[in-house]
Structure formats: structure tokens, C-alpha cells
Amino acid sequence: MQATALVVTRRRIARASGISAALLILLSSAACAGGQGTPWGAGQGREYPLHTDITATTFWVGEVFDADAPDGSQVYSTYDKDWYASYGGCDGAVVGGVCQTEPRSAANGYFPTRMTAEENPFYLDLPFDDVNNASAAGMRQRVVPWAGDAAYSRGLEDPSFSLMKNRWVQLEHDGRTCYGQIQDAGPGEYDDAEYVFGAHDARPANERYGGAGMDVSPALNSCLGFAATNGVEGGVSWRFVDEGDVPDGPWSLLVTTSR
């Protein structure tokens, strides 16, 4: 982030004694409410293409929307087979033995209210799985813009090392700008390089879930002002951003670093 020492301090506070409500109100007011945030292309790092008018659906850690589908459970992610435990449990509320989502509020930085998150609640997926999809894995060195960066190039020979996990994405919807980290792959497709990395604003190859090009967490759902707590929302714009271009906000209070 912009101030490494400050972020490290906040991470320690978050894990040791819980998130400060007053700090979260300050951050969410400055970065989320009223559509305030970093303007598109205002960062100092690498520039990435903008993807516009994308449909997003909502998912959450612990959700099981189709127990019979190979990609129907968020108890695990393609990058973390123990995602549920790593995150700290159901990212919402367990009702009748079922993990359900819940409304989020800027008052506590869009964090869950009935559990303590151990990883960043601002997470999403994109349809490029460079670990478990052979097609995506085979092309990742060629298509992923940061594949040659020192932090990633040494992992190229390790098929279990993802170039996607934990990468930052800037999202805009209805005048609101928020940020999140990639923690899974989907929806529906897993090697859609033209859409994910292309420079010509290609449409997602996925035709399911309203043609969605991403899933976003409950925190991002609320931060972006989606109409439904668990629904499909159009009109989302997004682009990759380097970590140094991510401004302080509720998304930077608990940054996921697990590989």
C-alpha cells in the first residue's frame, strides 16, 4: 500500500484486538461512500486495461449453491483447499446448518458481523485458473502481465504456485470505487485469457449466471452498492492494479498473503 509501516500496524491491530470501528468508519467514508476513491489510471505502477459493463454475481466463503457441481462450493477455492478454515469460517451467518450471506455496512468497513475474518473480506474471482486448469496453466507465462516480475517468475516452474491469488483488482459501480483481492477462479470458465487480460474490453466467455465475468464477496457487494445482497448486478468496471497503487481503505485492514 502507500505506507507499508501503517498497513503492517493495522494488520497487527486487526488480528490482535479486532478492527477499530472508528478507524473503519473513517476509511470507508473516505474511500467508499459517495463514490470517492482513486480515479481510474491515477496510480504510479503498471497500467492495466479497463473492462467495462461487466456482470457480477455474489459469492462467499462457506456458500454451497450446488453440492453436485464440481465448482458449486465455496468451502474451498481453487487456490486453497481449506479456504473455509483459512478465512475463519462462514463469511456470513450459519442458519439451520447452512452458511448464508448477510447485509454489510460502511459503519464497520463492510466486515462480517457474526464471525471474525482471518483473511481479507474484500475478495473476488476471475475466470482464469492457472493452477488447476491445464489450458490456463499452459499459457500463464505468456498472458499474465506480471509473470516476469521477480515475485512471480521464480514460481513459474511450480505448478501449485498461482500468479493470480492475492492480486489486487480495482472495481467501480454506480460511482463507487472499491478494491479486492483474487481468491478463487470463475465463474463458469477457467481459461478466459482474452477477457481477463485482453486490451480490447472483450466480453466474458461464460454464458451462465447472466453471463457474469466475476464473483464478488459480500463486502465488495455492499461497498459497490449492489441492489441485492445475493444477486446478479450489471454495470461493473474493473482493472488489475499493482499493490502499490491500492489506496488505504477497509480493504487494506486485513490483507491476505497466504499462498
Residue positions per predicted region:
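Secreted/periplasmic proteins
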Residues: 33-259
